[in-house]
Amino acid sequence: MRNAQKPSGMPVHRYMPFQDQITVELPDRTWPDKVITKAPRWCAVDLRDGNQALIDPMSPARKMKMFDLLVRMGYKEIEVGFPSASQTDFDFVRQLIEGNHIPDDVTIQVLTQAREHLIERTYESLVGAKQAIVHLYNSTSVLQRRVVFNQDEDGILDIALQGARLCKKYEETLADTHITYEYSPESFTGTELEYAVRVCNAVADVFEASADSQVIINLPATVEMATPNVYADSIEWMSRHLHPREGIILSLHPHNDRGTGVAAAELGYLAGADRIEGCLFGNGERTGNVDLVTLGLNMFVQGIDPMIDFSDIDDVRRTVEYCNQLPVAERSPYGGDLVFTAFSGSHQDAIKKGFEALEKDAAAAGKDVADYTWQVPYLPVDPKDLGRSYEAVIRVNSQSGKGGVAYLLKNEHSLDLPRRAQIEFSGVIQKRTDTVGGEVSGAQLWQIFQDEYLPSSKEDGQWGRYSLGSFSTETDDDGAMTLHATVTVDGVQVRRTGSGNGPIAALLSILGQDGVDVRVLDYSEHALSEGGNARAAAYVECAVGERVLWGVGIDSNTTTSSLKAVISAVNRAIRDAQA
């Protein structure tokens, strides 16, 4: 097949391939052969890196709500602000400490640039804290060295080392606070690896990194510049060359400029990282920080405990939306409104069959469905494990088929339609969606079903030519049955009698008196619930003249439900003929 694509005409000559800017060579890479088996150390940076990117930065009340959420979910390292950058951030750090809001097993993290007055102010904000991470950073990339700082490699290294020494100096003012240091060569992805490791190792030496006093070296994709495999190669290269490696906690801080932040984090973790920084639902500058929800639940669906509680994902989303004053996208993995929703007919049918197989397999294994291995097509996770219901799993539009329609009727109304009846009713729905367009809600679908198959509940409703009233039966010695029934025909109530080898056959005899030729082709019934007051649903496939249609009857009496189903099929056939 010929490729008909043509040049775009866009100014591609203005952009430089990454490999022409930064060299990352690792022919003996080992990360592709590894698999993730446990969760990393997490650090949530919503309150700083996320907050700085908001149109309306969080108020103190919204910050506290976000902090409480992160603690409740199980995050043990939380970046809470840049206290030397604003009075608001300084005051919030003080509020957390003085108000005793920080659990003993949670470590707050504060950010600072490598300037003495900023570092001094940072340490002032931490007075009284039990433990804290002081996060020092300066930019090291080729572009920022040239454009922003107008400094060579040695000049940028001096900035980092001066900042590290000042941190150690002011640490002496916090005798009762255990300080862990973190250093980030900002814009790491735009920095030569040999230079990045030179700076990081020099800073780690000043911080006296050791197995007993580890230093966090954080390698940010401040701007995502290449494919995730390149980021992973750079992380493995750094992991091999950082020293002392046992004294280093290697941390990742991916952004999502190319849309692959999650993949970069996962591959970077395989490549030797120990820790990942990010935000819930990927908030952050430009296209955002890496999404901690996606990362954590990607592990969960692989049978790995993320060490974070996502069991009420809707509450997490609502809180994040309130605090950030930004919506979470409907297609956002795991948390969006539509992520567990199937509109496609083939998808719906597979999901329906998957649920049925799951129940069957769990019963055969003697286990509750909630404890059985989850395997349902198109649903990588059980929505109930995230606090969701199955209500929105299947929704109906013009792309839907019988599986989705049948699923909704069964789950919302306990109606288990026979396969051919499913096909027939899905055609009714398809005709409606093709005509009107849009989605058919569960309530609308039920209304359409009632209008099509069941007697109208409205006094002035015109359901069809026939309506069944009270009846009685008699059985003679030969087993033949006589049906005495009150039937409404064209709005007029009449008393009719018919005979046959059962109640349905007797009703067909009555209908035959009006010249209505009916043959029953298929029949099934089931209870709609359990207990003495349970109602039954009956489904009857009838040939009425040249038309083959299904009827449905619902009643607390099984005989009545079957007779109603025949009337339903006959009325539908007559309506169809008149149309």
UniProtKB/Swiss-Prot annotation:
HAMAP family: LeuA_type2. Belongs to the alpha-IPM synthase/homocitrate synthase family. LeuA type 2 subfamily. It catalyses: 3-methyl-2-oxobutanoate + acetyl-CoA + H2O = (2S)-2-isopropylmalate + CoA + H(+). Its cofactor is Mg(2+). Pathway: Amino-acid biosynthesis; L-leucine biosynthesis; L-leucine from 3-methyl-2-oxobutanoate: step 1/4. Keywords: Amino-acid biosynthesis, Branched-chain amino acid biosynthesis, Cytoplasm, Leucine biosynthesis, Magnesium, Metal-binding, Transferase. The keyword Metal-binding applies. Residues 40-314 form the Pyruvate carboxyltransferase domain. The keyword Acyltransferase does not apply. NCBIfam families: leuA_yeast, PRK03739.1. GO terms for cellular component: cytoplasm. It comes from Arthrobacter sp. (strain FB24). One of its GO terms (biological process) is L-leucine biosynthetic process. One of its GO terms (molecular function) is 2-isopropylmalate synthase activity. Homodimer. Residues 456-579 are annotated as: Regulatory domain. This is 2-isopropylmalate synthase. It holds the Pfam family LeuA_dimer. The gene is leuA. The lineage of its organism: Bacteria, Bacillati, Actinomycetota, Actinomycetes, Micrococcales.
